[in-house]
Amino acid sequence: MAALRGGDLRPRLTQGSRGTERRVTQESFPEIREAVRKLCARFPGAYWRDLDRERAYPTEFVRALTEAGFLSVLIPEEYGGSGLGLRAATAVLEEIHRSGCNGGACHAQMYTMGTVLRHGTPAQKQAYLPKIATGELRLQAFGVTEPDAGTDTTRITTFAKKVGDKYVVNGRKLWISRAEHSDLMVLLCRTSLRDEAKTSAGMSVLLVDMREAKGNGLTITPVRTMLNHATTELLFEDLEVPAENLVGEEGRGFKYILDGMNAERILIAAECIGDARFFIDRASQYAKDRVVFGRPIGENQGVQFPLARAYVQMTSASLMVDKAAELFEAGEPCGAEANMGKLVASEASWFAADMCLQTHGGFGFAEEYDIERKFRETRLYQVAPISTNLILSHVATHVLGQPKSF
């Protein structure tokens, strides 16, 4: 498929369906969705099961998405992307996950580059964005979290000291996904000591060339987890980064990172919607096919009701995510909507996962059905990025006006 361009696949609403499902909401970007489905069909469950066993990176899948232009939908056309916007990006990720694939290996390329796009210099944008769009450069790593600074980003201690025409970085990062498979990393670090009166001040963003950094002050250690997410621990020991790689102004990094968080929340929520659809599709078909006591198990309300509830929750969450994406594209404040959308979508996908596993019974635990793999993958999204509890705290404090609880 030729790379996407802005004029190719503008949204046209349709009553499209999947299987025997009669959609109760309109489906946006049908051409994009169909193209993504066709691409994902080339990477069936066996492909993902093999990678999962070895905890290997889906290089071929990411390359195919890049060549098709799906990972550059948020990059403006002037820099080689399609400039289609966030709603198109949500359609891409939703369909990837509905197809049984996983966008976790590459979704950061969609939103991480936004820091450079919004706050980088013209020279930085021209140097990096066109190459990110073509896949010549991979910007997959987002260095924020530390062992003692997860939810509270203001507690990061990784420090970049300005020495002449470079920064010298020392510190440690944890849960940094795809660092081994990224050419560039957006790194949040301190450039001045933490001020208790202004805890979010004094942080800056550096664009790190991982190809030069590895073995020259940067050590990457893989962290094996319950799912294939290519996450790592990073150790910085006098890593030198050119001063020209500072993104925006020194000391304003926390604000720059926050600017991209809403897009991240919305895109992850779209993946959750895709996961929920995957589980609902699988459970619905299995309930029709599986015969017990002489009739399909789907004739029992005990099977029907959880399936129906999963669909209701998924559809409701999808509407919330769509609303958040619309606000984001319109340039309107959408922090609450993005966070709430991510919360309800992650809960919908987890309910659907549990329902699907229960519907399949023992078969759900068999690797060949792909349910246990997707079950493990979708559980992550109630923890990261941003935990369910932190979203609830955000809503209580910033929406309902309650006292800060942390």
Predicted segment positions?
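A short core secondary-structure module
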Residues: 3, 166, 170-217
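Alpha-helical interface subdomain recognition
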Residues: 3-4, 8-9, 13-104, 111, ...
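Short Ser/Thr-interspersed hydrophobic loop/turn segments at strand-loop and sheet-helix junctions
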Residues: 69, 92-97, 189-190, 207-213, ...
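Short beta-strand-to-turn element immediately C-terminal to the catalytic PLP-Schiff-base lysine
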Residues: 118-120, 161, 187-191, 207-209, ...
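A short, Trp-centered hydrophobic/proline-enriched beta-strand micro-motif
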Residues: 135-144, 188
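Hydrophobic, small-residue-rich alpha-helical packing segments that form membrane-like cores
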Residues: 150-152, 167
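Flexible, small-/acidic-enriched active-site or ligand-binding loops
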Residues: 155-157, 212-240
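Long, acidic (Asp/Glu-rich), low-complexity accessory segments flanking structured domains
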Residues: 238-255
